[in-house]
């Protein structure tokens, strides 16, 4: 059971990190003041394999409609993916991905909605940027140098995801042997240096809590790990860049109330000072964040 005493101990051990500030910047003409106002990123899934059925759109029209609804509900950015990160999901080739992504990107950008594209493919990244994408949500390290250069050339922001593997579809076991934060800090420091050398100025860091590692299939182990990282987010902010979290569903615990899971995890992520919330439940997360501001 999570207790107040544990939160107090965490803060006492890392008091200096609690006051860390991160870079603020504009994306596509929109200013993000992360230190005073967290942002929300809504999700549109173009893959039929995606687990969160409410976010799945199987046509361009449905995807554009959902993107516009998310923006109207308060999403600052709409994140689009054409290949599920689920371990059993089908692989989707570059041409098939771009065939789905590009029409949606173009229509949402025409509506002045900021668009992020989740990918680990340089070819998909290039096509998405040329179509007007504002953010690359990178779920792999292979080819990252190329994609960083592409992002810099288009003045796009980059979300660097922590991945223990070549990409999100090729991961094994997550190292749970010790405190994960120093390991993530080292990984992000290396990737930040590579990105900055490539000319990327707008960087966001994502611990990758939604990825399917083999040894995190046990629900209690996985959720305990996720909760721990959410609450320790402020320690990663010492790197000087905003932190993004993809909010999980924890169906094993929430069952028929699974749509309440992301709001629950949003509370923990907010306590940890998360800067960007990636969610399938935009209005619920907006309500949580607005309510927490009242205190």
What are these regions (language model features)?
Residues 108-113, 197-200, 238-239:
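Short helix-capping segments at alpha-helix termini
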Residues 27, 52-61, 65, 85-103, ...:
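Active-site-adjacent loop and "lid" segments of alpha/beta metabolic enzymes
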Residues 39-43, 76-79, 114-116, 134-135, ...:
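Structural preference for beta-strand elements that scaffold enzyme active sites
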Residues 48-57, 75-82, 203, 209:
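Glycine/serine-rich anion-binding loops at beta->alpha junctions
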Residues 47, 120-121:
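A generic "binding-loop/recognition-motif" signal
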Residues 65-81, 269:
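Catalytic domains of carbohydrate-active enzymes, especially glycoside hydrolases
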Residues 1-48, 196, 290:
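N-terminal amphipathic alpha-helix/helix-capping segment at the start of soluble metabolic enzymes
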């Amino acid at each position: 059971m999570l207790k107040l005493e544990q939160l107090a101990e965490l803060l006492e051990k890392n008091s200096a990190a609690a006051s860390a500030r991160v870079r603020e910047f504009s994306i596509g003409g929109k200013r993000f003041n992360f230190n005073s106002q967290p942002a929300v990123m809504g999700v549109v899934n173009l893959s039929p394999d995606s687990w969160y059925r409410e976010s799945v759109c199987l046509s361009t029209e449905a995807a554009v409609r959902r993107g516009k609804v998310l923006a109207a509900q308060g999403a600052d950015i709409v994140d689009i993916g054409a290949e599920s990160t689920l371990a059993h999901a089908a692989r989707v080739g570059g041409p098939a991905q771009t065939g789905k992504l590009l029409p949606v990107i173009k229509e949402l950008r025409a509506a002045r909605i900021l668009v992020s594209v989740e990918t680990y493919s340089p070819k998909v990244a290039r096509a998405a940027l040329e179509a007007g994408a504002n953010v690359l949500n990178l779920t792999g390290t292979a080819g990252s140098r190329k994609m960083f250069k592409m992002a810099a050339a288009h003045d796009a922001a980059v979300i660097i995801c922590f991945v223990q593997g070549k990409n999100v579809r090729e991961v094994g076991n997550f190292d749970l042997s010790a405190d994960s934060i120093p390991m993530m800090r080292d990984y992000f420091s290396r990737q930040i240096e590579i990105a900055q050398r490539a000319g990327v100025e707008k960087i966001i860091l994502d611990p990758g809590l939604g990825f399917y590692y083999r040894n995190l299939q046990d629900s209690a182990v996985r959720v305990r790990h996720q909760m721990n990282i959410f609450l320790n987010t402020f320690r990663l902010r010492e790197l000087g860049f905003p932190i993004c979290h993809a909010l999980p569903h924890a169906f094993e615990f929430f069952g028929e109330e699974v749509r309440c899971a992301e709001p629950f995890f949003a509370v923990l992520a907010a306590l940890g000072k998360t800067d960007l919330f990636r969610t399938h439940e935009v209005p619920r997360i907006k309500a949580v964040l607005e309510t927490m501001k009242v205190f």
